[in-house]
Amino acid sequence: MRFTQAELQQFRDRTVPDLLPDPLRLLFIGINPGLWSAATGAHFARRGNRFYPALHRAGLTRHLIDASDGYKAEDLAELHARGIGISNLVPRASAPADGPTAEAL
């Protein structure tokens, strides 16, 4: 999946659904989703993001998750089975340079 900058801008202020499995064993909270994450519907989805490789290297996931094109069913199943949740402090997506305002935080 590829997006132009103009296409990504269409996802500004969109949200990415929280992942909150039951039982929840470990919760990661980001500041706010990026435009790529909003476009794909997956947390930490930008190509090159080290979040999922770090989870895998730490032994928290059995396989390496690549969320750059959105979550695959087996990726969501793995996160749920492991009790790994992901949410954001500010739900609305923005470009990194436009991060959330102090009021939003």
Sequence positions of predicted segments:
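A polyanion-binding, active-site-adjacent surface
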Residues: M1-L105
